[in-house]
Each structure stands twice: as C-alpha cells, then as structure tokens.
Design a protein with these regions (language model features):
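Glycine/proline-enriched, intrinsically flexible loops and inter-domain linkers
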Residues: 1-470
Length: 470
C-alpha cells in the first residue's frame, strides 16, 4: 500500500508450482538467474531442485537497476527478506547458473512453443439431460423432498465455520433477514481503502449443478456460467462488467477417448456461454487427476462470476415485506437475446427501487426460491390461482423478484403474506415443519443450532494429578 514502492515495480509474479523456473522465468524474454542467490530453507539442494521446487509465500518483482537499493530498504523496513537473484538480458534466452556453471540455457522461442505438439482422440456423446424430479404426489410431499436434498438443504453450519467479517468490509452477510436464515447468493464486500470511505464493492457468485454435469458436461458447464452471472444480476450488478474464473475437476484421462470427451465437452460448453454473453474467463484452476484407484470424481466445472458495483445499489434476496408482488422472469437459457434483455430489465428495476429482493432459480425451481427468500424474515407466499407454472422445474437463468409495485416484467407468481405459510391451489402449507427438514438435514454433521436439554462438558486445563513413571 506504499505508493512509492509499488510504482517501482515493473512486473511481478507469484511463486507456486514450478518455483523459480516459472515465477521468475515468465517475467521477461531474456533472464540470467543465479540459483546460488536464491534463499532456501535448508542446505543440500542441487541446481535442479533450486530451479523447480515449489515454493509459497514468495513473490518475484522486476525493478530498474537504479531502484534496487530503495526497494531493498523498503522491504527491510517491513521486516521482509528481499534478494537480487536475476537480471533481465537483451538476448531472449533463459539461463540459470549454479556454482558458477550454466545448467540451463534455453531460447525463449522454444519455451513459448510449449514443446512438442500433443494429440489425442476425444469422443463426445450426444447427451440428453433429464429433468430432475422430486418425489411425492402432492406439493407438500415434493416440497419436503426438495428441501431435504443435499444440494438444496441448509449449509449454514458449514458456512459459519468460516469468518465472513474479516476486514470489516462485508456488505452482505452470508445469511439475511432478521432470523439470518436466507442464504445470500452473492458475496459482496467493499474494496479496502486506507483513508475515507468508499461505495465501491466487488461481487462474486458461483454456478454449478452436479446432477446436470454428470449427464452432460457441455450443458452443465454452459448453465454453470449462466447461473453464476444470473446471481450477480439478482444482487444488483451489471453482467456486462463481469468476468469469470473456473474451477474444474475431472478423472485421470489416460488414453480413453470417452474420458477425454468429458473435459472437452465441458470446456466447449463454458466457452460457448462466454461467447454468447460476451464475458471472458480470465483465470481458473484445474485438476485432471481426480482418480483414486478405481474411484473417479464426476465431471465438474464450477463457474465464478465477479463484477464491480456500488454498495448503495446492492440488494439482498430475503423478502422484505408482506403485500409485495412476486414475479418470475424466465426464458430459454440458450436464447441469449432474451436472457440478456431480462438481465437489463431486472437490473433497471432494481436500481429504480421497484425490485427489493431477487433470487436466481436453481435445482428446486420457484418453490426453492420462495422458501429461501421467505425464511429469513418468515414471510410466506400466496400463489395466484391463475399461475400455471411448475413450482419445482429447474430454470437456470430465471429470476424471482419481490416488487414494491406490480411492474410489467415476466409473469406474476403471487404475493408475500405475513404468515410463514405457502398457499397454493387451496392448500395452506405450514412452512415451520418444512423449515425443520431444511435445517435438520445436515445438523448432525455441521451443527449450528442450540438444542434444548443439551449440557456442555466442562473442560479444564489444570492438572489435578501428574503421571509418574512406574
């Protein structure tokens, strides 16, 4: 945060896998690296180990020669170890010396070629995605089955094992409403500033549906991107300012064309979504060795969408008040023109104050959205008699809106009511029992609720007896 120091840095790179050879080797076309000057935790490492050993918590920076002393002095004031280990050279070659001997001498042209070409065969099946069906003959039975699904039930006990308040910049806490039970779909925090205040925030949301990815890696990856972006829009962010990053896991490839076909299809689906939305992925993390003996991970691509915004324009997903209209805005997620038009319309309504909460639909469809939006403030829903949509249909890219006025956007689903109930087709469902299913599914694994009658075991670190040798 010292501007005088940061302006000295021409280029920098973080250390990680590959160590010196990657972190420093990527900084310039021509480099002379003295491995004897590289700080090490212990002696005995040879030149190869010094060059390629993974190292963390280190950074390589490029400085002008006349700025080196000033930078070293600044590092010393912060109790940081800084060492000159390399020089940028005019000749485009990567050279490394160890004990006075040049042990690496490679042309940059060769390094940039990524070595010899590699070819493989990928077989991509024409997969059909079957819609997920929740068990039950009645709305009550389907709602109970849906809320007990591991991909839908409460993860609050797990979430609360992590501190969401570090830096005191959190805008949206993980769970909203006066009961703090509505899960926020977007992580929003102010950017850190040393002086004054700021309204600028960053928003991040994820998208992933394993039940779709297992059937069709292409469709699952495409919809992962759509879902992550839709969540940002529902929090008040402009999708046109978003960027993406992906996390991927796949089984070990080997030489099996069908195994190669899974990441091929997944990345193709994610690429098509980027091209359709005109949003780029600027980074990612992948693992192509998700196999242990005969066990394979399912094909997995998780999309994270990140965008800048203003705290004053951010909304949270919990229902705010009874008597508000609930509207559903949806379309085919592959109809890019309709989808982006929906994004723009919803964002405009949010910024105009006409939409006070919004939810990006997922596996549980409208029913999941109504329940999770309502649980934070225990505000229920009365569904209109003329609403004929499927409450439990998965609709990626669709948005459920709480409106302060009955705006002309999408279709009207119903209205919020002060009782914690769901009224649908003459049936009045008490959601308190459903809440127990939702919260109790993982309570034994990730407990976060106090239970009546429990006693806390007393722990003492004062020894009353001391063991002695026999």
């Amino acid at each position: 945060r010292n501007g005088e120091v940061t302006r000295l840095i021409k280029r920098c790179n973080d250390f990680g896998a590959g160590g010196v050879s990657v972190a420093i080797g990527e900084l310039a076309d021509g480099l002379m690296i003295d491995l004897d000057k590289v700080p090490k935790k212990y002696d005995g490492l040879d030149g190869t180990e010094l060059a390629i050993s993974e190292s963390q918590e280190r950074m390589a920076v490029v400085l002008a020669p006349e700025d080196v002393d000033a930078f070293l002095a600044a590092a010393n004031r912060e109790n940081l170890e800084a060492t000159v280990v390399a020089e940028v050279t005019a000749e485009p070659r990567l050279r490394m010396t160890w004990k006075g001997v040049t042990i690496v001498d490679l042309s940059r042209e060769f390094l940039n070629s990524n070595g010899a070409e590699k070819h493989t065969t990928a077989s991509v099946p024409d997969d059909d995605v079957k819609p997920y069906e929740f068990a039950g003959d009645t709305v009550t039975e389907k709602l109970a089955d849906m809320l007990g699904n591991l991909n839908i039930c409460s993860k609050q006990g797990l979430s609360e094992r992590f501190d969401s308040t570090i830096g005191a910049a959190t805008v949206l806490m993980p769970f909203g409403g006066k009961y703090q039970l509505t899960p926020n779909q977007t992580m929003v925090a102010k950017l850190p500033v040393l002086h004054g205040t700021t309204d600028t925030v960053s928003g991040m949301a994820y998208g992933m549906h394993p039940e779709i990815l297992s059937q069709s890696p292409y469709e699952g990856s495409y919809l992962a991107v759509i879902e992550s972006v839709t969540k940002l829009v529902c929090a008040g962010f402009d999708y046109k300012q978003a960027y993406l990053t992906f996390q991927e896991y796949f089984e070990r490839m080997g030489t099996d064309p069908t195994r190669w076909g899974k990441p091929f299809a997944a990345l193709l689906g994610a690429l098509d979504a980027q091209l359709d939305l005109n949003i780029a992925a600027i980074g990612g993390k992948d693992s192509m060795s998700g196999t242990f003996e005969k066990m394979d991970v399912p094909p997995t691509l998780c999309s994270f969408a990140i965008a800048p915004g203003k705290a004053s324009e951010v909304i949270s997903p919990e229902f705010k008040e009874a008597g508000h209209a609930i509207r559903l805005v949806s379309c085919d997620p592959h109809d890019t023109a309709a989808l982006t038009a929906n994004y723009d319309a919803v964002l405009s309504a949010i910024r105009a104050g006409k939409v006070v909460s919004a939810w990006a639909l997922g596996l549980g469809g409208v029913a999941e959205g109504l329940f999770k939006m309502g649980i934070g403030n225990q505000i229920g829903t009365r569904i209109d008699d003329d609403y004929d949509g499927n409450l439990f249909a998965q609709q990626i890219g669709a948005m459920l809106l709480e409106c302060t006025e009955d705006i002309d956007l999408g279709v009207k689903v119903g209205d919020t009511v002060p009782e914690w109930v769901l009224e649908y087709e003459g049936e009045r469902i008490d959601l308190t029992a459903m809440q127990e299913i939702y919260e109790g599914k993982l309570d034994k694994v990730f407990s976060y609720r106090g239970h009546t009658g429990e006693t806390t075991e007393k722990f003492s670190y004062s020894a009353e007896t001391y063991p002695v040798p026999a």
